[in-house]
Structure formats: structure tokens, C-alpha cells
């Protein structure tokens, strides 16, 4: 478990791990040069529970910390937990049971997203208690990014699948970099319908922070993931091809949108990202599989480089609350002015 600047969340996370119903755990806390009290708190936890080992290292980022934990791990199975999240008490036991019962290489559980206001949202609600997939089915699910996302947490892995330097150091979206490679190593993949992982949504996290590095890292990761899947599935069925095209079309649309609306990007950064996305989108068909009418319209406006119309379309369809607020403010200001001007015309 990588630990960095999570003093407020560390205790509930560690408590959820040491409270697992499956007791034979090796718990590795990797202090990634955290500037707060986390290093001392980790040592205090190690004194309370002999299963806990603490590694202290210079700050190298999430990937570097995860790699350090992997190098230190001695168990047959590996479970990743982020230090601002928490897990259900039965998570390790239930997932290990499924691993053994189905002779699986990887087991996935469902998760709930927890927002700062305390609201919780279950991210996926399947109809079957357990689903067992082969490798090609798993690749298709990764492309759809619904039930099977690219997160490395909420999964139990056989240790032999994971090289010691699995994650790319210095890159964000490291999960997406490695998931296709891990999937290729699996024969059997099990997806449980139960929620065992609680993901704490961070409004200031990497996923929400739109910098030039983050946007380029995201494109790098997605391109590598898709290249890996194409390499592992050279005779890709049409359904998988459509899923990949739809994902690329959605990503192109989202990044075009970021170029339009993110205020922190410089003009040079906007140009660089726009050129990169344009080059990527040129490889897509004019009709992206699975797009609805609103998405098709938005996509075509970008393809035709009509950015002004695209911005209006974005505000009208994808940012309706903000658009409605602006309209109400405009009406509130304009109506009294209109009435006053009409009165002046009447008496003049």
C-alpha cells in the first residue's frame, strides 16, 4: 500500500486491512517520502500488528512506491489498496475463495465511489453473482471500460503474474499502462458482484486535474493499452473493433473538449494536444460505433474544426446546469432594463 500525504485517511484504511477475516496477511506499507505524519503513523501501526512491514523511501511517485512494495512481497497472492480508500472486512477471504474455486489467475470485485459529502455511488451492478471470463472476453470488457475497468486495485492477483518493476515510473494513469499486459497472462478471470472496495473520490486528484502532462500521459497510456490489445488479439472480432473505436471516439471528444474549456492550458499546449488528438481521430471512421445523436453531432463539429459551434453545443447539451444558470442571470438583468427602456420610449 503506497502512503503519501494521507494523514487524514490512513487510520480507516489500515484498520480495514488489519480487520480482515482472512488473517494470514503480509501487510506492506510503503512510505513514499510523505511530508506529513504518515511515516510515524505507519511505524506505530507496525508496532501494534506484527503482520505490518513499513518501507521508507524517497518520494518517487505512485508507480515507484507500488514497485517497491512488489519487490518486498513474499506471498503467493497480491492485493493493492490505495491509502485513502478502505476495504470490506471479508474482501481478502471472499476473493481468495473465488481464486481457488474457479482456478482463476485474477479476481475482481465491485466498488463504491465515496464523495467528500459522504454520498456513495456503486459503480457497477451486475445481474449474476459470479462471472467467469476467458482472455478475449476480458480484453473486450477492458475496451468497454464498464464492468472491468483499468484500476489495479479491487483485484486479487497471482503473484507470479506481476514483475517487480511492473508500473512505469514518472507516468500518471499507470494502471492503464499495465492492465492489458496482465490480462494477457491470465487464462481465467473471475468477476464477483459483491462490493468489497470503497474508493474515495478526490476532486483534486490526477483524474480530475487537467494539465498538459496529465492529458498527454492519459493519451500515452490509452495508446499503449490499445496497442497491446491489438498485439495480443491480431484477429480481433468486429465487436471488439467497435468497442475500441467507440472508446477512441469518446476519448478524442473528451480531449477536444478539454482543449476548449480547460483554462490552465497555454496556447502552445492546446495546439500540441489538439494536433495529437486530431491525428488519432483521423484513424477513426466518420461514424463511430455506439455514439448517440448528441455525441455524433459534437464529434462532427470537432472533425470539421467548427470550434465555436462545438463550444456552444458543449454548453447546451453537456453543461446544461451551468448554461441554465447563465440564462437565468441574463434574463434577471435584462428584463428590468427592457422595462425601463420601454417606459422611456413611451414617455418620449
Residue ranges, per PLM feature:
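Donor-binding/catalytic cores of nucleotide-activated saccharide
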Residues: 62, 83-190, 200-213
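A conserved acidic beta->alpha catalytic loop
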Residues: 16, 31-40, 58
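Catalytic core of nucleotide-sugar-dependent glycosyltransferases
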Residues: 196-202, 209-236, 253-285
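Short, well-formed alpha-helical segments that are part of the catalytic scaffolds
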Residues: 5-19
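Short aromatic/hydrophobic "clamp" motif used to bind/position activated sugar donors
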Residues: 78
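Short alpha-helix within the catalytic core of nucleotide-sugar-dependent glycosyltransferases
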Residues: 11-15, 39-43, 67, 75, ...
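A short, glycine-/small-residue-rich helix N-cap motif at loop->alpha-helix starts
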Residues: 58-64, 70-73, 171-172
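Membrane-interface aromatic/basic loop that binds lipid-linked glycans or pyrophosphate carriers
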Residues: 261-348
Amino acid at each position: 500500500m503506497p502512503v503519501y500525504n494521507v494523514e487524514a485517511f490512513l487510520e480507516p484504511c489500515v484498520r480495514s486491512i488489519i480487520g480482515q477475516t482472512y488473517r494470514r496477511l503480509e501487510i506492506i506499507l510503503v512510505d513514499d517520502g510523505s511530508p506529513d505524519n504518515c511515516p510515524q503513523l505507519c511505524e506505530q501501526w507496525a508496532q501494534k500488528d506484527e503482520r505490518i512491514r513499513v518501507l521508507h523511501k524517497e518520494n518517487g511517485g505512485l508507480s515507484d512506491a507500488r514497485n517497491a512494495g512488489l519487490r518486498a512481497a513474499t506471498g503467493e497472492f497480491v492485493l493493492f489498496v490505495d491509502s485513502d480508500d478502505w476495504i470490506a472486512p471479508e474482501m481478502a477471504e471472499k476473493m481468495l475463495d473465488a481464486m481457488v474455486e474457479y482456478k482463476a489467475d485474477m479476481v475482481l470485485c465491485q466498488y463504491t465511489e465515496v464523495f467528500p459529502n459522504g454520498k456513495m455511488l456503486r459503480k457497477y451492478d451486475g445481474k449474476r453473482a459470479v462471472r467467469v471470463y476467458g482472455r478475449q472476453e476480458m480484453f473486450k470488457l477492458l475496451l468497454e471500460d464498464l464492468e472491468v475497468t483499468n484500476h489495479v486495485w479491487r483485484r486479487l492477483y497471482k503473484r507470479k503474474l506481476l514483475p517487480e518493476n511492473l508500473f512505469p515510473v514518472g507516468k500518471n494513469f499507470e494502471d492503464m499502462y499495465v492492465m492489458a499486459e496482465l490480462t494477457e497472462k491470465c487464462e481465467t478471470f473471475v468477476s464477483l458482484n459483491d462490493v468489497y472496495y470503497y474508493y474515495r473520490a478526490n476532486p483534486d486528484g490526477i483524474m480530475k486535474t487537467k494539465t498538459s502532462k496529465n492529458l498527454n500521459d492519459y493519451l500515452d497510456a490509452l495508446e499503449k493499452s490499445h496497442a497491446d490489445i491489438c498485439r495480443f488479439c491480431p484477429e480481433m472480432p468486429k465487436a471488439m473493433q467497435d468497442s475500441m473505436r467507440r472508446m477512441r471516439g469518446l476519448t478524442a471528444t473528451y480531449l477536444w473538449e478539454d482543449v476548449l474549456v480547460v483554462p490552465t492550458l497555454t496556447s502552445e499546449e492546446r495546439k500540441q494536444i489538439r494536433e495529437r488528438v486530431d491525428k488519432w481521430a483521423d484513424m477513426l471512421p466518420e461514424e463511430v460505433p455506439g455514439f448517440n445523436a448528441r455525441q455524433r453531432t459534437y464529434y462532427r463539429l470537432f472533425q470539421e474544426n467548427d470550434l465555436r459551434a462545438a463550444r456552444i453545443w458543449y454548453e447546451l447539451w453537456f453543461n446544461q446546469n451551468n448554461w441554465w444558470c447563465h440564462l437565468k442571470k441574463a434574463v434577471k438583468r435584462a428584463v428590468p432594463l427592457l422595462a425601463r427602456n420601454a417606459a422611456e420610449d413611451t414617455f418620449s
